[in-house]
């Protein structure tokens, strides 16, 4: 999910996606760009997500463009201001109007690859050294039908975020600033009770709207043994979350509200409200990705108040969700354009600690310090831990850390040598699934008499009929 926002989807988008997929099978892969060269014979690389207003982002990318064209005189960059959202992507892809280079999220890889909208980058990944240096857990997130169709941009795994001040008041911190780690979801409830009793604040906060609720719920449900979909022998997809395991996970969420009274009074919590509640000290814990401190400082949360640790276990599995963003290349691109795109990508996402990488990384960390953000979390990297880029970034984080490192040490150790299963997001219609699950969560948090199994039975049927059947 990250910071790249997606507009809420309706059933029509699922139908449009299905139609676009059908069109792609007939012709998307066969035709390459006709105007891939300019008058000077340079390869034209159209770059999407170009900032459309003055500011740091525009200045940075314009400087990168100038350097790139100087270092790669056979390529010319053309600006494209479109940014990814599912409501326009499939129409643009079917119409052949995607920029050569674009960005998206892990959740789109399977569908983009299946539709033939993303170029096969397998050989390019080998040529530029990415294949030997990519984190194995991330590789499967950029692979569709045994083809690598994207280069990872960033990655993160879920952890248990906590408010240091509330943990201290609740007696849940060691003397050196290390939090006590709940081993499972039952202990999370006990910790939340202590926070509510000792501080008067909500022990836990969960998002419930704009797909954020479903996003978090999937990772919880997996640990209860739930499965959300499976591919049949005929290639079709079947929804599979009308099960006792999924119902048990939803019951755990429901009990936070009705049995234990540990959640905020407002049950309609979108992404911004989620971060606002946590960032203003109104809740003690949540499930969040490792980059969450960037979101909560705008609400006044100070670096010394921010903590994160390992994801707790469930009754059936100990698993965490892997999320992230990707670089992709249109399947309409010629071989020269694919090569140019890979060179462009290397200036943005690299496993090598080049001079430019070192400069950009240090400047970024110093800017975070100026902005009052936490420096200390070593997020899950798309690259192997022994790559020079990861090592250099970690050295800088240790050098510039602006809070007690023990507040995040358990998460950093968890990321460095993750002892549990790291699972990518669901492969098909993932954003639609999140919306469906949002509705389930809202139903059980607003209706004390809601039957979790019945709620999921209907949701499973709706998801199958409205989305999976349209693939």
Model regions: which residues?
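Conserved N-terminal structural module of periplasmic/extracytoplasmic solute-binding proteins
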Residues: 2-115, 125-130, 174, 336, ...
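Extracytoplasmic/periplasmic solute-binding protein
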Residues: 33-34, 144-153, 158, 168, ...
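Alpha-to-beta junction loops
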Residues: 75, 93-104, 117-119, 201-202, ...
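Short helix-initiation/N-cap motifs at beta->coil->alpha
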Residues: 80-89, 107, 183-187, 265-280
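Short, solvent-exposed loop/beta-turn-alpha elements that line the ligand-binding surface or hinge
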Residues: 92, 119-134, 177-181, 204, ...
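Glycine-centered hinge/linker elements that transmit conformational signals in sensory
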Residues: 187-194, 234-267, 307, 311
């Amino acid at each position: 999910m990250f910071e790249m926002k997606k507009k809420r989807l309706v059933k029509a988008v699922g139908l449009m996606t299905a139609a676009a997929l059908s069109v792609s099978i007939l012709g998307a892969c066969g035709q390459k760009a006709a105007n891939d060269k300019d008058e000077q014979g340079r390869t034209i690389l159209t770059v999407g997500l170009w900032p459309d207003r003055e500011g740091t982002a525009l200045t940075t990318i314009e400087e990168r463009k100038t350097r790139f064209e100087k270092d790669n005189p056979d390529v010319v960059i053309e600006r494209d201001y479109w940014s990814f959202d599912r409501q326009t992507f499939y129409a643009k892809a079917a119409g052949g109007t995607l920029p050569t280079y674009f960005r998206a999220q892990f959740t789109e890889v399977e569908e983009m690859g299946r539709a033939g909208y993303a170029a096969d980058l397998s050989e390019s990944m080998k040529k530029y050294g990415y294949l030997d240096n990519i984190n194995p857990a991330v590789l499967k997130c950029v692979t569709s039908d045994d083809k690598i169709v994207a280069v990872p941009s960033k990655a993160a795994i879920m952890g248990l975020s906590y408010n240091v001040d509330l943990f201290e008041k609740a007696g849940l911190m060691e003397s050196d600033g290390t939090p006590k780690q709940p081993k499972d979801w039952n202990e999370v409830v006990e910790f939340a009770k202590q926070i509510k009793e000792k501080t008067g604040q909500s022990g836990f906060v969960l998002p419930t709207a704009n797909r954020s609720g479903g996003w978090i719920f999937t990772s919880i449900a997996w640990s209860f043994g739930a499965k959300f979909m499976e591919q049949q022998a005929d290639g079709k997809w079947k929804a599979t979350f009308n099960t006792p395991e999924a119902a048990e996970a939803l019951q755990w969420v429901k009990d936070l509200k009705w049995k234990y009274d540990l959640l905020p009074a407002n049950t309609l919590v979108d992404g911004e409200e989620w971060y606002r509640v946590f960032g203003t000290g109104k809740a003690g814990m949540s499930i969040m990705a490792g980059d969450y401190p960037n979101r909560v400082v705008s609400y006044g949360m100070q670096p010394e108040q921010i903590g994160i640790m390992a994801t707790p276990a469930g009754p059936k599995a100990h698993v965490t969700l892997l999320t992230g963003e990707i670089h992709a290349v249109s399947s309409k691109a010629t071989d020269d354009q694919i090569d140019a795109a890979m060179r462009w990508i290397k200036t943005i996402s690299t496993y090598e600690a080049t001079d430019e990488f070192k400069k950009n990384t240090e400047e970024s960390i110093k800017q975070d310090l100026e902005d009052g953000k936490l420096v200390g979390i070593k997020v899950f990297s798309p690259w192997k831990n022994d790559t020079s880029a990861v090592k250099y970034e970690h050295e800088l984080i240790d050098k510039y850390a602006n809070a007690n490192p023990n507040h995040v040490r358990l998460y950093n150790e968890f990321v460095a040598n993750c002892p549990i299963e790291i699972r990518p997001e669901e492969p098909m219609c993932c954003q639609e699934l999140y919306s469906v699950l949002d509705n389930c969560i809202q139903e059980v948090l607003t209706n004390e008499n809601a039957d979790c199994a019945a709620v999921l039975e209907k949701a499973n049927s709706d998801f199958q009929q409205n989305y999976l059947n349209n693939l």
